[in-house]
Amino acid sequence: MYIHQKQIIINGMLVNYYHRTGDTQAPVLLFLHGWRSEGKIWQKVIGELSEYSSYSIDFPGFGQSDLPNKDFKLQDYSEIVSEFIKKLNLKNVIIIGHSFGGRVGIKLASTSPPSLSKLILVDSAGIKVKQNSLKKIIAKIIKPIFKLPFLKSTRKKIYSAMGSEDYLATPELQQTFINIINEDLTSLLPKIKIPTLLIWGENDKDAPLADARTMEQAVPNSKLVILKDTGHFSFVDQTEKFVNNIKKFV
């Protein structure tokens, strides 16, 4: 079966998604992409999991979906996924979330929706990065100055130097990005009651392995799998091993 591209209206916004039909008796796989990415990134993985019905969405602001109709918070993205599941009447859903998509998966799974049966977090974000004291001081000093129009180019250089390329990549989503990264999901992890698989790249620099271990300890029914010779996009670096772990867990 081919992967079909479709659209749906959710909360007044067009949401683009990709769908491949599989065994109707098997669990449904719902893939959530990371920041600056889109649903297409999962197509190779979906192709290797052809026995399952699979969906991958473009979050509002990414891919071919509409921009958010306001400055989104993580809860808004969680509601988009929840409404997507309801509108398509999906049951026995397994969410597979990468990076930012993992954040959304954590947020939704912590509310124990009956439609979700399992959760797979892939190099997931969600543990808030702790700024060191120097960065906090610098931020307090330069934030008011940054607002001056003639310092726009300087602002971009400093943001890049501080590792905030995601902030610059999607200017329409800058406040949304700030809302997202400022939310620490640590307190939600113990509320996840469904079986959870953590798949992590051994050399992930964006979501360090220490975050994976924190999540494994906090989520009651969880297991961590570390893929060697992989980075933040472990499912791209080692697709075959990634897919094999999915099949074992599902």
Task: Specify the residue positions occupied by each region the protein language model found.
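Alpha/beta-hydrolase fold catalytic core
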Residues: 1-29, 50-52, 90-91, 132, ...
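Flexible "cap/lid" loop of the alpha/beta hydrolase fold
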Residues: 103-111, 117-148
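Catalytic histidine-centered segment of alpha/beta-hydrolase-like enzymes
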Residues: 230-239
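Short beta-strand/loop motif that positions the catalytic acidic residue
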Residues: 192, 198-200, 204
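Hydrophobic, aromatic-rich cap/lid helix
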Residues: 159-187
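Conserved alpha/beta-hydrolase "acid-adjacent" motif
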Residues: 205-211
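Active-site loop/oxyanion-hole signature of alpha/beta-hydrolase fold enzymes
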Residues: 18, 55-96, 244
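Conserved HGGG/HGGXW glycine-rich cap/lid loop of the alpha/beta-hydrolase fold
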Residues: 20-64
